[in-house]
């Protein structure tokens, strides 16, 4: 690891012929689309298994063509535009949301940076391109996609989409800061912002081991950035009908759905690159097989890691309930941002100590990472525990109905009952009271001690 940030050697990029660049761009697009089609079916299958159902099984073998059938159905539906919508922005919003989702994959490495594979006789890297500030490019592109959601909510001319757009904007602002801090810790420790160089620095240990807090922070923020459960507040069906895309139909609605799943694949690919060794084979495989990281095999390891993270998305959706909006904001501003800033300071300190050739830097990083990871998990558990305590609090019984509360008799509403009418005292008790005897009704239970014979003497 280089002790200081320096310009990386990216000479292997920019030398491919134009037709090879087009082929690699088409491959990146096809990788995203095929992964999205598979992920939709995979999600429906996994959720069905969790709910003891069968899931899609009609179109294609094992229902694998269900996503393709749904896409064709959406494109053939009638395209409606509401009267109060700003038509130009209304049509532009799905495009603004979808295009940035495809851009980040351009700097993700699928294999070693060296010329490892041959395509039609040309040796080339398994990456479309790389930049000295590739991760800043990914962070900037992720921020642009939110404009599509905000514009969709504003241009629809409806209340529910507007609220969904505002929620999405607030959620992005709250979680983008913690995501940037998680990225910055990786930059500091690896000494590079190039994606290929970050993967190269993980040859001995993945950053999920060295930077566990950064990994946890990024996983939480990537769920918030993609508006997935349990952080899907911008499209909460319970209070916003459908959220920002309520007024959309046909291919425009399909573009929003496509952008959501492409973003899931993109953030999973970024997590794989930053923390899971990228295209590198897992430790047992790379130890016993020297050729595991050569040829086309890195593409397999990269795809498997991305699919595992996509399964994590699906697992969260099937197990965790949607959090309240105030809990979402509290987690972002009071937990993630403070923890990310403290962790960033610790990583910067360890980086400075490593530059001075101190040996205890890794130990301090491990200890500090473990402590902060436990604190972060405890904060998250406390939020859900507080929610459970509130649900278990005893509900106060409503006050008894008073028919004369307003000064005049009022009939009871449905669910209300009139207070019991006091029974008339028996004649013997009335005579005793007049003669100065004890009041048995006030000393005993309500209604007095009566029998049928005395009650008939009233």
PLM features: residue spans?
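Selective transmembrane helix interface/packing segments
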Residues: 2-458
């Amino acid at each position: 690891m280089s002790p200081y940030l320096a310009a990386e050697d990216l000479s292997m990029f920019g030398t491919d012929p134009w037709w090879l660049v087009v082929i690699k761009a088409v491959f990146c697009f096809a990788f995203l689309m095929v992964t999205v089609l598979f992920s939709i079916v995979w999600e429906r299958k996994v959720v069905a298994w969790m709910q003891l159902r069968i899931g899609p099984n009609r179109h294609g073998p094992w229902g694998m063509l269900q996503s393709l059938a749904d896409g064709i159905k959406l494109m053939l539906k009638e395209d409606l535009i509401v009267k109060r919508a700003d038509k130009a922005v209304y049509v532009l919003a799905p495009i603004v949301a979808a295009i940035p989702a495809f851009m980040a994959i351009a700097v993700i490495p699928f294999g070693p940076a060296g010329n490892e594979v041959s395509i039609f006789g040309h040796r080339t890297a398994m990456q479309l391109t790389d930049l000295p500030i590739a991760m800043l490019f990914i962070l900037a592109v992720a921020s642009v996609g939110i404009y599509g959601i905000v514009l969709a909510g504003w241009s629809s001319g409806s209340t529910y989409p507007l609220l969904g757009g505002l929620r999405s904007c607030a959620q992005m602002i709250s979680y983008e800061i913690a995501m940037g801090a998680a990225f910055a810790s990786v930059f500091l420790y690896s000494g590079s912002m190039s994606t290929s160089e970050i993967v190269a620095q993980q040859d001995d240990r993945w950053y999920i081991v060295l930077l566990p807090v950064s990994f946890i922070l990024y996983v939480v923020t990537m769920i918030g950035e993609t508006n997935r459960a349990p952080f899907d507040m911008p499209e909460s069906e319970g209070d916003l009908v459908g959220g920002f895309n309520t007024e959309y139909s046909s291919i425009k609605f399909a573009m929003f759905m496509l952008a959501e799943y492409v973003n899931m694949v993109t953030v999973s690919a970024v997590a794989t690159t930053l923390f899971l060794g990228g295209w590198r084979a897992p430790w047992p495989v790379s130890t016993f097989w020297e050729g595991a990281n050569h040829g086309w095999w890195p593409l397999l390891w990269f795809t498997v890691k991305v699919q595992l993270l996509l399964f994590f998305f699906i697992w969260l959706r099937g197990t965790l309930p949607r959090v309240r909006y105030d809990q979402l904001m509290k987690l972002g501003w009071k937990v993630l941002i403070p923890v990310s800033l403290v962790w960033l300071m610790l990583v910067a300190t360890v980086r400075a100590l490593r530059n001075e050739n101190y040996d205890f830097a890794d130990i301090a990083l491990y200890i500090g990472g473990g402590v902060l990871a436990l604190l972060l998990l405890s904060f998250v558990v406390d939020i859900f525990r507080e929610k459970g305590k509130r649900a278990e609090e005893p509900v106060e019984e409503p006050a008894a109905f008073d028919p004369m509360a307003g000064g005049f008799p009022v009939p009871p509403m449905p669910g209300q009952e009139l207070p019991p009418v006091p029974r008339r005292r028996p004649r013997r008790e009335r005579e005793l009271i007049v003669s100065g005897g004890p009041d048995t009704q006030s000393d005993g239970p309500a209604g007095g001690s009566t029998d049928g014979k005395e009650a008939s003497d009233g």
